[in-house]
């Protein structure tokens, strides 16, 4: 009894000390913040700030949009220990991503970035500096240049045919198929063939390949804007109370095993080619990166960044994870919207019949003439951006934005979801699926970062470098699915019954997978074609 009483007193004393410390910290923080002219926003609680508002029933992007509706398009809130500024309108995004891009284009330290990208050696999480500039240049001139993307056009066409064959096989029984499962398999093979080569593209169906795919799914599900509280409250990060770091390390070890095998295989193939006296020709992005890595070791200037072996792995991981997830998720959302809006499906089908005809599949050369398909893709990206909150930016220095202070060290979030549904930018039914809004003069509204009302790939220095490849994958995917099959919902399921709930991780997938019946509508021999 005496021991229990002593423990109770000790716990009460510890709680009192904690409350006093929080009060002291909050008071000191309040005095410092009075010297700043911060954007309007909610006050928040000690220690956690406004993190609680993002942990409720609403997904973070929707919760932040609701707060911005009360406090304004440029909003300040404290998330844990950090000042956070949120841009929720096209004008606010323009200020963050263009006007003040130089000061706000850095990245904050994150456990996911440090662990899974080999100590910030990729492109997504890497802070600004010589290495990031080198990686960005490689993406623009080597990995995702127009010439490189064009060189893999046949690969993309072959995987579209493989997707059609798989769906054709399911059509015989008139059974509903899980759309994302089929599309994700095709995009995985597509990206693997481009990134790591033909030999490794079949690993999707192997036990090791399946484990790799599951680990990617787990990483995407676990890595969201506020999924790891330790990112926002540093002492909780040190304790790893959610086990987030342990999970990331486990996934990293699995991925590293996979990438190391790929690199060793490529190096051996290159060695054999050189030993036989033949000229080695790069056939995939690993070949390109290994060659660039070797060349970077010969640089004489100490100021120039090198591309280490782990950097090759980190860049390949960014390509595989980003390319697979974003394309598959967007195609599934597009098909869900078309199934919920039969009139839009009919318009897309009519356009394909007119432009392509019934004697062949859609080729990438057809895409510039498929204006309605382009509008469907843009409208899908507007309503369902894969990353509704762009990857967080970081203020490297104190900056004044629209007359408000953004303190050095602040996190800066761009709510692409809120911007894309802002009545100020989209006055005509902003929550409705209307591809027609992107036809005519509005067709000039693009997704490549120049139009701040539509930012699925970001803008400025941190724009996604693979946006052109992503658009080709999604547009060709949607076009071929609609062209090759007449789609309908399963018996007993009405359009209004199709759930549009979101599951938020690093990407925003459908919470309920889309099931639909695909009935072939082209000549039978086309479904057995490989080219």
Curated annotation (Swiss-Prot):
Keyword Transmembrane helix: yes
Co-factor(s): heme
Pathway stated in the Swiss-Prot or TrEMBL entry: Secondary metabolite biosynthesis; terpenoid biosynthesis
Gene ablation phenotype (knockout): Impaired biosynthesis of dimethylnonatriene (DMNT), but abnormal accumulation of (E)-nerolidol. Reduced levels of trimethyltridecatetraene (TMTT).
Subcellular location: Membrane
One Pfam family here: p450
Keywords carried by this UniProt record: Heme, Iron, Membrane, Metal-binding, Monooxygenase, Oxidoreductase, Plant defense, Transmembrane, Transmembrane helix
EC number: 1.14.14.59, 1.14.14.58
Top enzyme class: oxidoreductase
Catalytic reactions on record: (6E,10E)-geranyllinalool + reduced [NADPH--hemoprotein reductase] + O2 = (3E,7E)-4,8,12-trimethyltrideca 1,3,7,11-tetraene + but-3-en-2-one + oxidized [NADPH--hemoprotein reductase] + 2 H2O + H(+); (3S,6E)-nerolidol + reduced [NADPH--hemoprotein reductase] + O2 = (3E)-4,8-dimethylnona-1,3,7-triene + but-3-en-2-one + oxidized [NADPH--hemoprotein reductase] + 2 H2O + H(+)
Example GO biological process: response to herbivore
Induction: Strongly induced in response to herbivory-mediated wounding.
Cellular component, GO, one term: membrane
Bilayer disposition of the protein: Single-pass membrane protein
Gene Ontology MF terms in the entry: 4,8,12-trimethyltrideca-1,3,7,11-tetraene synthase activity; DMNT synthase activity; heme binding; iron ion binding; terpene synthase activity
Highest taxon in the source lineage: Eukaryota
Residue numbers binding heme: 464
Family the entry assigns: Belongs to the cytochrome P450 family.
Job of this protein: Involved in the biosynthesis of homoterpenes, attractants of herbivores parasitoids and predators (e.g. predatory mites and parasitoid wasps). Component of the volatile terpenes biosynthesis pathways. Converts mainly nerolidol to dimethylnonatriene (DMNT) and, to a lower extent, geranyllinalool to trimethyltridecatetraene (TMTT).
Name of the protein: Dimethylnonatriene synthase
């Amino acid at each position: 009894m005496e021991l229990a009483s002593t423990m109770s007193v000790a716990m009460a004393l510890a709680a009192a000390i904690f409350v006093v410390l929080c009060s002291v910290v909050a008071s000191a923080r309040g005095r410092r913040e009075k010297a700043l002219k911060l954007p309007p926003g909610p006050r928040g609680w000690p220690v956690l700030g406004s993190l609680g508002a993002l942990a409720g029933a609403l997904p973070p992007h929707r919760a932040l949009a609701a707060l911005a509706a009360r406090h304004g398009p440029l909003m300040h809130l404290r998330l844990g220990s950090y000042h956070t500024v949120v841009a929720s309108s096209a004008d606010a995004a323009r200020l963050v991503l263009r006007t003040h891009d130089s000061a706000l284009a850095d990245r904050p330290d994150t456990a996911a970035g440090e662990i899974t990208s080999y100590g910030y050696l990729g492109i997504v999480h890497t802070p600004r500096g010589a290495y990031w500039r080198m990686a960005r240049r490689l993406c623009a001139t080597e990995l995702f240049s127009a010439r490189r993307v064009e060189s893999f056009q046949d690969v993309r066409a072959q995987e579209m045919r493989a997707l059609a064959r798989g769906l054709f096989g399911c059509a015989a029984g008139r059974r509903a198929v899980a759309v994302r499962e089929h599309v994700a398999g095709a995009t995985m093979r597509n990206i693997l063939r481009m990134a790591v080569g033909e030999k490794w593209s079949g690993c999707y169906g192997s036990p090791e390949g399946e484990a790799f795919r599951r680990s990617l799914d787990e990483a995407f599900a676990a890595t969201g804007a506020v999924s790891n509280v330790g990112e926002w409250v540093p002492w909780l990060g040190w304790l790893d109370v959610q086990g987030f770091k342990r999970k990331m390390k486990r996934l990293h070890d699995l991925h590293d095993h996979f990438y190391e095998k790929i690199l060793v295989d490529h190096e051996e193939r290159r060695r054999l080619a050189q030993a036989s006296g033949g000229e080695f020709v790069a056939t995939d992005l690993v070949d390109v990166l290994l060659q660039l890595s070797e060349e970077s070791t010969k640089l004489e200037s100490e100021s120039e960044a090198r591309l280490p072996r782990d950097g090759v792995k980190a860049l390949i991981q960014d390509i595989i994870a980003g390319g697979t997830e974003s394309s598959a998720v967007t195609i599934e959302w597009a098909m869900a919207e078309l199934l919920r809006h039969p009139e839009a499906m009919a318009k897309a089908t009519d356009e394909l019949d007119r432009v392509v005809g019934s004697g062949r599949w859609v080729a990438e050369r057809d895409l510039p003439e498929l204006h309605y398909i382009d509008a469907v893709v843009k409208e899908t990206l507007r309503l369902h951006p894969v990353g509704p909150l762009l990857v967080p930016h970081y203020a490297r220095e104190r900056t004044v934005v629209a007359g408000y202070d953004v303190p050095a060290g602040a996190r800066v979030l761009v709510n692409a979801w809120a911007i894309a549904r802002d009545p100020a930018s989209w006055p005509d039914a902003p929550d409705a699926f209307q591809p027609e809004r992107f036809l005519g003069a509005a067709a000039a509204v693009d997704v490549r970062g120049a139009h701040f009302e539509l930012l699925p790939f970001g803008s400025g220095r941190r724009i996604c470098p693979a946006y052109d490849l992503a658009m080709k994958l999604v547009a060709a995917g949607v076009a071929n699915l609609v062209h090759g099959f007449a789609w309908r919902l399963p018996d007993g399921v009405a359009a209004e019954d199709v759930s549009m709930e979101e599951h938020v991780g690093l990407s925003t997938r459908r919470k309920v997978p889309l099931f639909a019946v695909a009935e072939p509508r082209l000549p039978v021999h086309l479904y057995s074609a490989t080219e």
